[in-house]
Amino acid sequence: LSGGMKQKLALSCALIHKPKLLILDEPTTGVDPVSRREFWEMLQNLKNEGITILVSTAYMDEAGLCDTIALILNGEFLKIDTPKNIVQQFEPEIFSVQSNQRSKLLTDLRRLPEVSSCYAFGDSIHVTVENKKISEEELQNFLLKNGHEQIEIAKIEPTVEDCFMELSKQQEENN
């Protein structure tokens, strides 16, 4: 059986005695994207049947599917709330940035004092800017001066992962 099939079988076995509470520890780690989606559809159906589900996951897109999430770093709670509220409370601006030199882009962006955090996110780099200290145009000019081409910059809405990354950074600075 594939990893996804094994997880779905394990979930089915856990449901035999019709539990009111289901605790799952990273159930989709190492599972292909299609099986992950199917697994979460199964969890949604179980939730609709009144089963309470507690899930630990490192996948922030999965955490965003939950009713309430606890963001945890090194065993400490950073925030507990709904995904929607966590994202709405996020104050800094975030830009999605791409150029033809991804590694150099990450290095250059991290040199900017206006940048609070900067990390790879899919094909782009997510750049967090505190207090609107830099505009898209200023960011574009900085990258052009540093030899970047094919630059794409877009202001974006934060994701749960963006919020987690920023809260993690703040926690590490406070310790």
Residue ranges and their predicted role:
Residues 18:
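Conserved catalytic motifs of ABC-family nucleotide-binding domains
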Residues 80-81:
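ABC ATPase "signature
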Residues 91-170:
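Short, charged/small-residue-rich alpha-helical element at the C-terminal edge
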Residues 37-49:
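Helical segment within the ABC ATPase nucleotide-binding domain
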Residues 75-76:
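Conserved ABC ATPase "signature" C-loop
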